Amino acid sequence: MRIKLIKTFTHNNKEYKELNFDFDKLTGQDLIDAEEITRRAGVNIAIGAADFSRSYVLSVAAKAASLPREALLNLSAQDFTNILNQTLIFLSGADSGTLEVNDKTA
């Protein structure tokens, strides 16, 4: 899944205008590893609540993007939130292509 960024950011002297998240490549071990990375970052995860921790979701997103989680922390707030939301959709088992957004703008 490619996500176009609202604001470009730089990591290791490379400028990114979009990021590719390959959620299909992730394994169960990757999710366990993401939980451990989150704990090492000092975030206490309650059993069963890991999927809802922003820090855990960030760790999963970073694994899917093959970037360190610290790099994603430098994204704009809008881009960061969008990426976390897309990662939550993945973690919930929903297909983002089947989700509908009801836009009722006046």
Q: Each predicted region: which residue ranges?
A:
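Short, surface-exposed, charged amphipathic helix/loop patches that serve as local interaction elements
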Residues: 1-106
